[in-house]
């Protein structure tokens, strides 16, 4: 696993987030991250707003004084999004919305 400091730019839905990832040496890249082990309702489905709002609150509690979260990742999923873990957020969301099949999207 690789660990990075990142700023959350946009919460796409309850399991997808856009980050500006700090690579060091004043180098930052923007990536779309998919929370590992979590599968929240998609936009337009029941509980979509609830899942998205819960993620928003969890991210707010994970931010450090500079506004960064710590994310870990090793690979991209089948749709090109980085599969990420952000503090304890994945574990908390997976209790309500676990990813039910092998692998991850």
Residue locations for each model-derived region?
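Small beta-barrel nucleic-acid-binding modules, primarily SNase/OB-fold domains
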Residues: 1-105
